[in-house]
Amino acid sequence: MTPAQNELLKELESFARTAPTAEAVMERIAKLLHEKLTRYNWVGFYLMEGPAFDVLVLGPYVGSFSPTLRIPLDRGLCGAAATSGETVVVNNVGADPRYLGSDLVKSNIVVPIFVTKSEVTKSEAKKRVVAELCIESYFADTFDTAEQKFIESCAALVGRYME
């Protein structure tokens, strides 16, 4: 991570310690990432819902275009990240048929969020994706390894406050 990313992560961690809800943490992350990292054109969260937790529903977001409101788990990059439990990075979305969004977007990263409260074991947490952090950019090759690590740290921060 860059020094600027480390500082931003510290700021988010400080806010999260006193935030009233996980949703407030998500709102702050979306707002600050969108404001401070100008290559991020859309920053938002999708939450697992449905009777079998089989659909992702739009949560807090900040961005320049209308997002998809509901995503079944068998569709798109968000569905792929939710079902695999792994971060999905695509730095050329035009070459990936799973991408569902705007033609203006060139890069996309989706990071699954797991409950990481102390009473949940690591094996239980890994099985239970509860949300996702999704970031889109109008620039190709936005998400390198350092960027991915930073975004995964932001997502993990949310997981500490999810039920």
What are these regions (language model features)?
Residues L37, Y99-V105:
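Short loop/turn motifs at secondary-structure junctions and domain boundaries
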Residues T2, E13, S137-E163:
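Juxtadomain coupling helices with adjacent low-complexity linkers
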